[in-house]
């Protein structure tokens, strides 16, 4: 286990019930007292609530509840249902980032999600002549003053401890009058305060699967895990592979990764994918149109990123309600081919795969498309058939010109500026999806 520099100070900030708070502020309501959920009720009462205000959480309704579960606990008409407005949330998030950047250089900020960020405030404590909690409270109060949104914060000697202080300690503290909670941890206090904490799933990066596997070793707390690692770490490596190092480090309160490390990391995209849960189960003809739209959108992403693919995968999940038989509930297939970015070719390959794997007597409720083995255009030399060199080259050139022209039109006028004819057929979802962010209306 590598020791980290304990002299650094990190601040983790989680904006409280962010989507719900934005909707409350838009309506002139107090985010801490208003009863509001963010959900698209047009998707039926089974739709998942993207956010729940603190006042409703106090009644036992938590984030990701389904709308009918809210109705079971709170009378209809006694709370507000706000339709998701993702563009608004992104706008407010960017405004809050600007507030962070007024205190800390952008290279010392890591945006973890739309409502959560990490700041390395080490070198700023002397600048502002504040201790860590004073600076944290100053930043959070500034966010509150400008946006009406409060936050929970954690301070730590590394990124992990800052997040755990926020996730576990701060969220169980009594809030101040503005709803702000701040907690702090270093390696020593972490072991003192949280080595006996249960359940393990409260800790960052430990989900139900890992927790169950640890239970099989007789490990129920981080203290158990730390002690187990002293004498039987090889068992953890056999079970979890390279991830064992991370969970062992975290058991001891160690996290060597810094914000600078995160900033310098460049992810290599090996695949891109698109999935969709359909409003109702569809059979071949209508499903075919949806697949064409989704494949076309993936190809658009290929062209934007200037990538080529030589492999695709299609996964179908059948509608359980319409088909309660015990036969396999899904279909799956893949296809390999020469590297290309030609939309027509890729769509045709997806259609061939659909015809191969689909049971035409069963409606499909979910589908997922993936393009794999991605490579940059300039790294791939197309292997052309000896006798068809000129013909294939000319076709590829024409298609590439068409793809680039289409891309420019969409970039300038929007994704719905130019569409395939299938996008205007009954049952098409592309026009609506093009106006969404993260699967929800912008």
Provide a role label for each language-model segment.
Residues 22-25, 48-51, 161-169, 258-263, ...:
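Short acidic, glycine/serine/threonine-rich loops at helix termini
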Residues 3, 12, 202, 212-363:
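DNA-contacting surface of Y-family translesion DNA polymerases
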Residues 119-140, 218:
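Catalytic palm subdomain of template-directed nucleic-acid polymerases
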Residues 135, 139-201:
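Long, highly charged, low-complexity intrinsically disordered interaction regions
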Residues 1-114, 118, 249, 295:
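Residues that scaffold, gate, or flank divalent-cation-dependent active/transport sites
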Residues 112-116, 156-159, 307-311, 362-366:
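Short Gly/Ser/Thr- and Asp/Glu-enriched loop/turn motifs at secondary-structure junctions
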Residues 22, 328-442:
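Acidic, metal-coordinating catalytic segment for phosphate/diphosphate chemistry
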């Amino acid at each position: 286990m590598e020791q980290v520099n304990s002299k650094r100070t990190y601040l983790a900030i989680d904006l409280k019930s962010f989507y719900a708070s934005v909707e409350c502020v838009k309506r002139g309501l107090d985010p801490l007292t208003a009863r509001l959920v963010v959900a698209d009720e047009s998707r039926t009462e089974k739709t998942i609530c993207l956010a729940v205000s603190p006042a409703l959480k106090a009644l036992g309704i938590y984030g990701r509840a389904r709308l009918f579960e809210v109705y079971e606990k709170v009378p209809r008409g006694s709370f507000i249902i706000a339709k998701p407005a993702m563009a608004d949330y992104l706008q407010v998030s960017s405004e809050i980032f600007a507030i962070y950047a007024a205190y800390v250089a952008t290279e010392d900020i890591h945006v973890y999600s739309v409502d959560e960020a990490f700041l390395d405030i080490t070198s700023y404590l002397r600048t502002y002549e504040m201790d860590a909690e004073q600076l944290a409270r100053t930043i959070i109060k500034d966010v509150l003053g400008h946006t009406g949104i409060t936050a929970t914060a954690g301070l730590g000697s590394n990124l992990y401890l800052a997040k755990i202080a926020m996730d576990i300690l701060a969220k169980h503290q009594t809030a101040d009058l503005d709803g702000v909670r701040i907690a702090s941890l270093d390696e020593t206090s972490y072991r003192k305060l949280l080595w006996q904490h249960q359940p393990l799933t409260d800790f960052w990066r430990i989900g139900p699967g890992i927790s169950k596997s640890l239970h099989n070793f007789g490990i129920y707390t981080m203290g158990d895990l730390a002690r187990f690692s002293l004498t039987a770490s090889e068992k953890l490596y056999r079970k979890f592979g390279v991830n064992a190092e991370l969970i062992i480090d975290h058991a001891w309160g160690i996290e060597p990764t810094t914000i600078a490390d995160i900033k310098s990391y460049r992810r290599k995209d090996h695949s891109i994918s698109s999935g969709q849960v359909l409003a109702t189960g569809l059979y071949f003809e209508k499903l075919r149109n949806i697949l064409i739209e989704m494949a076309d959108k993936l190809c658009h992403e290929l062209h934007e990123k200037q990538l080529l693919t030589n492999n695709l995968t299609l996964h179908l999940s059948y509608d359980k309600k319409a088909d309660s038989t015990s036969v396999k509930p899904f279909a799956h297939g893949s296809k390999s081919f020469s590297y290309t970015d030609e939309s027509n070719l890729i769509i045709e390959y997806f259609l061939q795969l659909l015809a191969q794997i689909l049971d035409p007597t069963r409606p499909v409720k979910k589908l997922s498309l993936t393009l794999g083995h991605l490579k940059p255009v300039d790294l791939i030399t197309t292997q052309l058939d000896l006798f068809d060199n000129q013909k294939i080259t000319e076709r590829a050139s024409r298609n590439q010109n068409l793809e680039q022209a289409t891309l420019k039109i969409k970039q300038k006028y929007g994704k719905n500026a130019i569409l395939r004819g299938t996008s205007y057929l009954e049952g098409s979802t592309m026009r609506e999806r093009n106006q969404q962010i993260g699967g929800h209306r912008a």
